[in-house]
Structures are given as structure tokens and as C-alpha cells.
Amino acid sequence: MSPIQVVVFALSRIFLLLFRLIKLIITPIQKSLGYLFGNYFDELDRKYRYKEDWYIIPYFLKSVFCYIIDVRRHRFQNWYLFIKQVQQNGDHLAISYTRPMAEKGEFQLETFTYIETYNIVLRLSHILHFDYNVQAGDYVAIDCTNKPLFVFLWLSLWNIGAIPAFLNYNTKGTPLVHSLKISNITQVFIDPDASNPIRESEEEIKNALPDVKLNYLEEQDLMHELLNSQSPEFLQQDNVRTPLGLTDFKPSMLIYTSGTTGLPKSAIMSWRKSSVGCQVFGHVLHMTNESTVFTAMPLFHSTAALLGACAILSHGGCLALSHKFSASTFWKQVYLTGATHIQYVGEVCRYLLHTPISKYEKMHKVKVAYGNGLRPDIWQDFRKRFNIEVIGEFYAATEAPFATTTFQKGDFGIGACRNYGTIIQWFLSFQQTLVRMDPNDDSVIYRNSKGFCEVAPVGEPGEMLMRIFFPKKPETSFQGYLGNAKETKSKVVRDVFRRGDAWYRCGDLLKADEYGLWYFLDRMGDTFRWKSENVSTTEVEDQLTASNKEQYAQVLVVGIKVPKYEGRAGFAVIKLTDNSLDITAKTKLLNDSLSRLNLPSYAMPLFVKFVDEIKMTDNHKILKKVYREQKLPKGLDGNDTIFWLKNYKRYEVLTAADWEAIDAQTIKL
């Protein structure tokens, strides 16, 4: 054990014992005084949020202590966490799955306990190791939809000592070949429900990567063999699964994210992140071995894989899987699985609010809805309609070293993605910060006359940075992307507050309020400049949505290029609740909204387009990049109807004559 580990180990034990002692003394006193001074303690908690701190800190210290021991014993991998839960919670459900039936809207509930899952995984490990020659250290791709088979493959690869890479099952062609190549994939295991893109790309894969094996699984036959108690099993030797040279910042899995070139990047999920990181995250969101986390998010993304599966399975609870997201059957599946927690991302909550009332939407057991991307304008509406007690909005990036969280109840902290008590805030101040941006270019971090960055003042947008604790070995905190050193290096900024320090750049703008809460504002690429001013797309979207909540089902704002003008002009894309409205009705809607907008002229959307559907990613996030490429005046195919804000006073249809005048600059924007 290194000197630093010894110090951390000792301090964690001391602080843990100290907190236990204080908690032992304070708890009965607090209960007694609570009867007399209940309102005072409530106000104190509202101001300092000490209750959640008392809940989080002892567990965090205990986890750090146990993790250091596990690292010392070379037992830091998630496989050993899984074994622990098999031993302690063998009869508890580990996985449930609402398998879609032929009849639309009907499901067959499949369940597997921890001991059943363990036995299946050992049988599948035998097949993978002896029939397919999967070896420890191999990078093996899983191309699978949401179903128990995905988790069985995942755990089997961990048992063998291989590293799973989660392919987006919609990827095909060049991006698919690129994904396999940069990750040194040896073979791919393919779910029959996800096989079409691979089959379409098979010739391209074989030409570019002839050594990569494509294994098309027959799920029904395979599951029959895995459920047979007479099938042979394989448990890898510990010293092969976890060789002495393996460190806890090495890859536990690979998850693909979108790249700036249009090709995916393979983000490294370290063992530290997927094990102790997800354990602590689960505790912060009050997961226990009695909890069930329902996710309709794809397992090939980190939200479902790390913050769903890894988090709940490390606590001995149940992972409930939906085959894919369906707004119309969401609450029925939640009810069938008995979920206590549900995951959301992007616009999922808005989709659910726009569904007809279902008898299942209040028959569930859900206490916590957690995810990222819940907008403040529907935060309380979502909670009230679906009877959700707690919102767990978090901020994280797939490749980021840490996440921020909130456990929000009541009216305080709506919209925040980081909300802790005074003690944890102080601790996190050494780990996370918001830095000021250049007033002339909000994609550039501001540096003062000494060449250092400055913390963003309260209320001012700043880029979130996360500390890299060993600047000379940044991979111990931030592992980056496999096979892409350039992109990895671009995410690290140095000499931030002193010479030699290093921080991970999140690439997002957040702001802090006077209570220490943090709020997500924009992706760095989403903010645009017009008339030499920075425009927050989130602010404009929120105001535009609020101006007509009944008619505007979904609103997107981006900046688009206008020939002969510097910067980008505001462009709003609107999906209506009623798509049958004609141009006259749409014009009236826009001008009614205009009177309710409280935006400076430079932030007003100069151009507007109505669409039947806003294009989304596979993980239900808006594809803003597509809309940033909007061509004026009629789109690429010449069929778009675009509205424009004439003289900043009234919306009208953009005609050919209007565009000629704008292009000739006889009309100024």
C-alpha cells in the first residue's frame, strides 16, 4: 500500500468512526428536540441541507475504506461486488424484464434471482470461453437490445476477465467499422433483435477487419441451454481475471459517445468508476437491496449501464429492463416490475406528460425519478401528475471522472443538478469548480493577467471542471478514449489555478446560485453569438415553451448561419400538440408568443420552423447538430416553410422576396 493510500485509509477510518459517534449522540437529541423545535430544524435543513450530508458522508467514508482494502486485496472489480450480492441476497430478484408480446401493449414478466443469474452467467462463461475462445484481456463487443441476455453476456465477460464494449445497435457502415477498429475488438456477440445493421455492414467489416469474428446468437436455443442445470459451468481463476498488473483505473468496459468528426469515440469506464463510484451514486439516490430500478434507456449508454445497472446491482437490488422506451406503455411496465426508481433522460419526461391519462400512472411504487435533462418548466408538473416524491437530477458525462447529483423534494432546488449540504459542498470545492469564460468567446476559458483561471461568480455561467489529482498521470482520474489520444488530451486543461495543476473539461456551462446549488445551462456548442452577444439556447427554449405551454409540445433553439452576417442567428424548431394547424394559425401562435417573451432583441429567434417530430438520438436526446445546418430560405430540398421576425416586431412567412432583400442587405437582421 502506497503512503497516500495509507493516509487515506487511516483518515477514512477516523472520520467514519467520528461521524458514527456524532450521529449516535445527535440522533436521539435531534428527535427529542424535533418535537419542540421542528420548524426550526426544518428551516436549518433548508438552509444547510445537513440531513442529506449525514446520510451520505458515513457511507462514503465506509465505501472509501472498503475500496482501499479491495484494491490492496486485488478485488476491486465489479465481479466481486456481484459475488458479494449473490452470497448476501441470493434469493432477491436481480433482473426483471417486460418482454413484449405479439399483442401490442402486452408483456410477459421474466425474473431472475441473484443465484439464478450467477448460475446462468457461469454456464454462459463456459460457452464463451470454450466454444468461442474468449480470453482474459480481450475486448469483446456486445450488440444487443435491452434484455436479460445483455446483462448475462456482460457479467460473463467480466467473469472471464474480458472487457465488454457496448455497441449502439443502430450503428452501421463506416461508424460501426470505426467503433470496432479503435477498440481492438476481437469478436462481436449479436442479439437477433439487433442483427440487421451488422448484417448490412458485414462485407465492409470483413474487408476492413478480417480477424474480427461476428457471432450471431440464437437467443431461444441459447437460453434453453443456460437454464439447464446440467449445462457445464466455468468460473475464471482470480489471478487470471485480476492479474497483478491490473489497476483500478484500467477499463472495465467501453461505451461509445458521439465524436466531433461524426465518428464514435470509445470512452473508457474505469473499474473505480463502475464499482465504488456507482455504489456511492446508488446510495445518494437511496437505493437498497429492496429497491428496483426501472430503465427504458438503452444499456449501451452510461445512464442505464453505469447509473442504472451497476448502481442497483452493487446494492443487491433489482434491475428492471424495458425492451425499448414506449410512452404509451411506460407506466404499465413500471407497475408490472414494482419499480421504486425510474430513469429518465432528455425529453422522456415531456413525452410522458403528453400521453393520455393511464390507470397505471399512479398505481406504481415509484419514489425516485432520476436522470438528466428534466427541464424546470415541467419539473413540478411531472412530479405532481405521476405522484413522484423525489427528483434525482444529475449532471454527468460518459467519460467524466465524477457526477453531481440532487435529491430534490418540495419546492426548493427545482432545476438544480447539484444540491448538497454545507459539508459536502466544502469537500467538493476541492474536486469540482465553475470557471469564468472569455466575455468575447464563451468557448474559451478566461485567464487573468497572471495567466490563471478564475472561479465564476454566483449567477455567472462558467464551464465545469473536475480535478485530476495526479497531473503527471492524468489517466488515474480521467481515462479518456481508447485509441484516441488527441481527443483525450483535448479534454484536459492545465495551469488552471496554479502551475502544474490539471483539470478535466466538461465542455458544458453551468451556474451557481447563492445557496450553492448548480444549474445546467448549455452545452458549450449550444450557446451562440449574435450581434456580438452570447445567447443561451436553454434560456430561449424555456421562455418560448412557457409562452404557450398548451400548444408547444416541444421546442428546440439553435444558432444558424446567415450569409453575409457574423455569428449565428436564433432558429427555433417547434413541434405542436396539433399538427393540423394551417399557416395563418401558426403565424398567430408565434405572434401571441412574441408578446410574452422577455428576451433582448439579439436573443429573439429570428427564424422559426414547425415540424411533425423533432429528431432525436437513440437515447432520446435532441439532435441539435442536424438543425444547426438548416439552409435558408427553404431548406436543402426547397420545401421548408420558414417564418421570420420581420423588423423584430412580427413573425411572417419568409418569402422569396424577403430573402432576396435580406441577402442584398436592404433589409437588416
Swiss-Prot record:
GO BP, sorted A to Z: long-chain fatty acid import into cell; long-chain fatty acid metabolic process; protein quality control for misfolded or incompletely synthesized proteins; very long-chain fatty acid metabolic process
Superkingdom to which the source organism belongs: Eukaryota
GO terms of molecular function: ATP binding; long-chain fatty acid transmembrane transporter activity; long-chain fatty acid-CoA ligase activity; very long-chain fatty acid-CoA ligase activity
Keywords: ATP-binding, Cell membrane, Ligase, Lipid droplet, Lipid transport, Membrane, Nucleotide-binding, Peroxisome, Transmembrane, Transmembrane helix, Transport
Primary location class: other
Residues involved in ATP binding: 256-267
Residues in the Cytoplasmic compartment per record: 1-5, 170-270, 340-669
Motif FACS boundaries: 501-551
EC number: 6.2.1.-
Pfam families: AMP-binding (PF00501)
Topology of the protein relative to the lipid bilayer: Multi-pass membrane protein
CDD domains: FATP_chFAT1_like (cd05937)
Compartment(s) where it occurs, according to its Swiss-Prot or TrEMBL record: Lipid droplet; Cell membrane; Peroxisome membrane; Peroxisome
Intramembrane residue numbers: 271-339
Transmembrane regions listed in the UniProt entry: 6-26, 149-169
Segments in the Extracellular topological domain: 27-148
PROSITE patterns per UniProt: AMP_BINDING
Family note: Belongs to the ATP-dependent AMP-binding enzyme family.
Function text: Acyl-CoA synthetase required for both the import of long chain fatty acids (LCFAs) (C14-C18) and the activation very long chain fatty acids (VLCFAs) (C20-C26) by esterification of the fatty acids into metabolically active CoA-thioesters for subsequent degradation or incorporation into phospholipids. The transport and fatty acyl-CoA synthetase activities are genetically separable and are thus independent activities. Esterifies VLCFAs in the peroxisome matrix. The VLCFAs are actively transported into peroxisomes by a PXA1-PXA2 heterodimeric transporter in the peroxisomal membrane.
Domain comment (free text): The FACS motif is required for catalytic activity and substrate specificity.
Subunit structure: Interacts with fatty acyl-CoA synthetases FAA1 and FAA4.
Miscellaneous: Present with 16900 molecules/cell in log phase SD medium.
Name of this protein: Very long-chain fatty acid transport protein
Recorded name of the encoding gene: FAT1
